[in-house]
Amino acid sequence: GSMGKGITYLKKGNWRTNFRLENCQLSNHPKDYVWDFIDVTNDFSFLKQLMALGENITIEKEIDSFLIDDRKFDLRVYVCFGKLHYIFPRSNDPDAVIMNITQGAIGQNTEFILGDLDDQISEISKMAIASVETLKLNFAGVDILIEKGTKKPYILELNAFPGFTKPERFNISEAVIYEICSQKWD
């Protein structure tokens, strides 16, 4: 994934970006983490420079996130060989733009979502497994956001090389190795 880099958030009265532009060129940060957001509200010159880069730009509509304990969150769902192995909730402040752990989000235990999303777990599981199978992958992390009001799950992205959780939460490496060893290979 992009690790939360290269994002511009535009909402009426609230424009933020972690892009840096120098002389109409995209400037890379010296490190791959902590790409801080800066306020660019009503800075039309910034938008013009961004559009002039000629790069592919993805524009997405914001989905208002369901909150648990007054925290915005998403779910990293680990799928291996057609089975859901772990749901890893990642939470951040309600006004945060991203849920990436390297950018300030907090990894939660699965208990964080229990009670609030019990009715959605089956649909989340089916969506995650189907998306991984559609791309013909054996292993992936599927990022899912739950919409405020409807509690409808949305797939945000699929990561063929997802970061792993800490083993004390769930040892995803062990689960992947077990699944590989359990396969019947021709």
Model-found features: residue ranges?
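Short, surface-exposed charged micro-motifs
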Residues: 76, 143-145
